[in-house]
Amino acid sequence: MDHLPIFCQLRDRDCLIVGGGDVAERKARLLLDAGARLTVNALAFIPQFTAWADAGMLTLVEGPFDESLLDTCWLAIAATDDDALNQRVSEAAEARRIFCNVVDAPKAASFIMPSIIDRSPLMVAVSSGGTSPVLARLLREKLESLLPLHLGQVAKYAGQLRGRVKQQFATMSERRRFWEKLFVNDRLAQSLANNDQKAITETTEQLINEPLDHRGEVVLVGAGPGDAGLLTLKGLQQIQQADVVVYDRLVSDDIMNLVRRDADRVFVGKRAGYHCVPQEEINQILLREAQKGKRVVRLKGGDPFIFGRGGEELETLCNAGIPFSVVPGITAASGCSAYSGIPLTHRDYAQSVRLITGHLKTGGELDWENLAAEKQTLVFYMGLNQAATIQQKLIEHGMPGEMPVAIVENGTAVTQRVIDGTLTQLGELAQQMNSPSLIIIGRVVGLRDKLNWFSNH
């Protein structure tokens, strides 16, 4: 270990930055956030330093480097574009046994600055020891995505509860289970973020007073259309906290690889016209696992409230009194159209979008006359097997046969395939494609040749 990671208490302690440019400003922000009593020495300063000085947040000393400024300092940073000057600052600090950071020169410094994830009071620091700052930044960004934005507020609030929790729960095991429950409670985190004192109190009392083997909860998460990079930040956090993940066929392997390793995985895949697991049985799986006190994630492709039957599943939970929440996902219409270069709306071609299920029930009829109108985009989910019927009905009700159409297979995935043509060809085109596929009909499809960015990658 080349460096010892430490967290310094700098509040109301003298610190010095030598340099008045953009790099120095970034370092100054960190020291000001830490509460340091900051002096900045430079020949000239960018406007931000002047603004801080005018607000009484720091002291500016204009002129050449003055070593005496180090005499009362706890910490110094050399942040100029003059290597020789930076070396002088470092040596002067070393002579006074003051830790000094030299920007972009770790070998000349007595301490280095890590990449920081700030969820105060929770702080995470990542460093490559100065050997690969880009790697440290990438790791920081990955960790940022895993830590909820309001985690710091929850951590601070937890500190206020420590005494009461110690009184309430006799054993260390009980306390640990309580804290695990508190830190993953979305309602508490949101209430703290909104400063909703009533909700904070209600949630806290519920968490403290309910038995530790209480019923669990279900989180309905939209996995997006396929590309794992389109999974939302909150969705990622939920699947990495789950005890059980109940998922279907439209959830990609790449997304399942992000699921918490020791979580139970229950596959309930569905295909058009054939349900591998009946919907009622899926409802009962969610109910049964939650009643065991587990944190259950129901992971569905796209958005769970857009042709995902998410509402039906939640009704069962609601009737049983099981707590639940919903994390929306990018729906297939949005993802597939974007990755195919087809804007769903356009000032010249489409003022509205219609999302339509292609599962046409026996005896059920869509409003084909309105669907055939111009200046709109139609998106049919699960419509591959009904493509010929869709073609026939739209033409019968007045849609021009030359209306552009596209079918997107495995949208947003590396295996995405897109075929386009006209409405008169729709039934024939559908025979060349496999499920899952999305049908897009409208003048906007004509923009695909110009805007098709994904296939070029």
UniProtKB/Swiss-Prot annotation:
The gene is cysG. Gene3D superfamilies: Cobalt-precorrin-4 Transmethylase, Domain 1, Methyltransferase, Cobalt-precorrin-4 Transmethylase, Domain 2, NAD(P)-binding Rossmann-like Domain, Sirohaem synthase, dimerisation domain, Siroheme synthase, domain 2. The modification Phosphoserine is found at S128. Its EC number is 2.1.1.107, 1.3.1.76, 4.99.1.4. This is Siroheme synthase. Pfam families: CysG_dimeriser, NAD_binding_7, Sirohm_synth_M, TP_methylase. In the N-terminal section; belongs to the precorrin-2 dehydrogenase / sirohydrochlorin ferrochelatase family. Keywords: Cobalamin biosynthesis, Lyase, Methyltransferase, Multifunctional enzyme, NAD, Oxidoreductase, Phosphoprotein, Porphyrin biosynthesis, S-adenosyl-L-methionine, Transferase. It comes from the Bacteria. Residues 1-204 are annotated as: Precorrin-2 dehydrogenase /sirohydrochlorin ferrochelatase. The active site is at D248, K270. It comes from Escherichia coli O139:H28 (strain E24377A / ETEC). Residues 216-457 are annotated as: Uroporphyrinogen-III C-methyltransferase. InterPro entries: 4pyrrol_Mease, 4pyrrol_Methylase_sf, 4pyrrole_Mease_sub1, 4pyrrole_Mease_sub2, CobA/CysG_C, NAD(P)-bd_dom_sf, Siro_Cobalamin_biosynth, Sirohaem_synt_dimer_dom_sf.
